């Protein structure tokens, strides 16, 4: 079978080694003669899976001991509600920084539970889309927390700065599309959450990192399944968790550790992004409209100079084993999502195709 490279924004490509191991263990896991999908989440065998996954995740991100790690349901959209329901306390407002589609979606959900103070960080610089630096973000004095999204998958915009707003500002961040792709200082955040389906594992699992002093503040109307304290008190097993996604994510964590950890991913992700953006920037046939300082290393949107060629580009790239390159309906064009599991070889195959396509149709 020819090599297929999946550039989907999520659910996304998984490491081949992880899929091979899961395939081998699918019907007989740990010598039990059953699948990991069939064993009790409260049995000692799965408890070991859960504990190892949390330990490996903590090791990868150097999570401080005063932070809890929760394995949840609900995805990023679930956390759009969970954050205000858990962190507002007796306050009625929170700061939200709008830099793209997903930040705006979080704001829309937050309006059900509080009065968000919205700061529009989007700007245009020399005709390119960009984000105002954190030093210009206008925060309010009475906010319970400040929320932002470091990587906008649809817009292809990244905010790589580390928050430094003082110890009194609780920073909540949606790391769904950039978690584990580069080192982060967890201690600068109050809450970090991430849907699994991009850099962690299969869809269905959400990981939350929450500073322990923020527990116990949930709104009385907060559903129990979204209550961080209840999830923590029950070791993320208040109800039956997504066990297969948890298991497979644990395999991804071990794969990451075996391949140099987050620091190694950071380097190769930079190489992949530089290769792809390099082809775009050195061409009049392709274009990207994001300022270099805010370009995403995970999600690279680009347009063809002649949009009439879009359909042909997608057809020929798919035939060449380069799948899921169609851009989001909001922005159109193309988008290559190059998360941790995408090897440099895959990006090289894409750029070779792009150069050849331009030669034939430019």
UniProtKB/Swiss-Prot annotation:
Recorded catalytic activity of this chain's protein: O-phospho-L-serine + 2-oxoglutarate = 3-phosphooxypyruvate + L-glutamate; 4-(phosphooxy)-L-threonine + 2-oxoglutarate = (R)-3-hydroxy-2-oxo-4-phosphooxybutanoate + L-glutamate
Subunit and interaction comment: Homodimer.
Pathway terms, separated by semicolons: Amino-acid biosynthesis; L-serine biosynthesis; L-serine from 3-phospho-D-glycerate: step 2/3; Cofactor biosynthesis; pyridoxine 5'-phosphate biosynthesis; pyridoxine 5'-phosphate from D-erythrose 4-phosphate: step 3/5
NCBIfam families xrefs: PRK05355.1, serC_1
UniProt cross-references to Pfam families, sorted A to Z: Aminotran_5 (PF00266)
Record bears the keyword Cytoplasm: yes
Keywords: Amino-acid biosynthesis, Aminotransferase, Cytoplasm, Pyridoxal phosphate, Pyridoxine biosynthesis, Serine biosynthesis, Transferase
GO biological process: L-serine biosynthetic process; pyridoxine biosynthetic process
Protein name: Phosphoserine aminotransferase
Residues that bind L-glutamate: 9, 42
């Amino acid at each position: 079978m020819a090599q297929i490279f999946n550039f989907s924004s999520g659910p996304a490509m998984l490491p081949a080694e992880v899929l091979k191991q899961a395939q081998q263990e699918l019907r007989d896991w740990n010598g039990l003669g059953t699948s990991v999908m069939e064993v009790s989440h409260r049995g000692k065998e799965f408890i070991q899976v859960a504990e190892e996954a949390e330990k490996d995740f903590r090791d990868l991100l150097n999570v401080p001991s005063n932070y809890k790690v929760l394995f949840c349901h609900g995805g990023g959209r679930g956390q759009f509600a969970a954050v205000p329901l858990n962190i507002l306390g007796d306050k009625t407002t929170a700061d939200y920084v709008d830099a793209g589609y997903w930040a705006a979606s979080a704001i829309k959900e937050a309006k059900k539970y509080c009065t968000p103070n919205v700061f529009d960080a989007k700007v245009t610089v020399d005709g390119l889309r960009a984000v105002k630096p954190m030093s210009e973000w206008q925060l309010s004095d009475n906010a319970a927390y400040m929320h932002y999204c470091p990587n906008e998958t649809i817009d292809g915009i990244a905010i790589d700065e580390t928050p430094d707003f003082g110890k009194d500002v609780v920073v909540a961040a949606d790391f769904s599309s950039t978690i584990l792709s580069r080192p982060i200082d967890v201690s600068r955040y109050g809450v970090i959450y991430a849907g699994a389906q991009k850099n962690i594992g299969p869809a269905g699992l959400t990981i939350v990192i929450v500073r322990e002093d923020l527990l116990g503040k949930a709104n009385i109307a907060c559903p129990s399944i979204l209550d961080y304290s209840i999830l923590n008190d029950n070791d993320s097993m208040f109800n039956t968790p997504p066990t297969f996604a948890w298991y497979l994510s644990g395999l991804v964590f071990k794969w990451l550790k075996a391949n140099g950890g987050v620091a190694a991913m950071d380097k190769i992700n930079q190489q992949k992004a530089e290769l792809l953006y390099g082809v775009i920037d050195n061409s009049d046939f392709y274009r990207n409209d994001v300022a270099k300082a805010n370009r995403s290393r995970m999600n690279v949107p680009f347009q063809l100079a002649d949009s009439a060629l879009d359909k042909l580009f997608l057809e020929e790239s798919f035939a060449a084993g380069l799948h899921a390159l169609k851009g989001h309906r909001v922005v159109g064009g193309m988008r290559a999502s190059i998360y941790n599991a995408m090897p440099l070889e895959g990006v090289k195959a894409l750029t070779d195709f792009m150069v050849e396509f331009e030669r034939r149709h430019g």
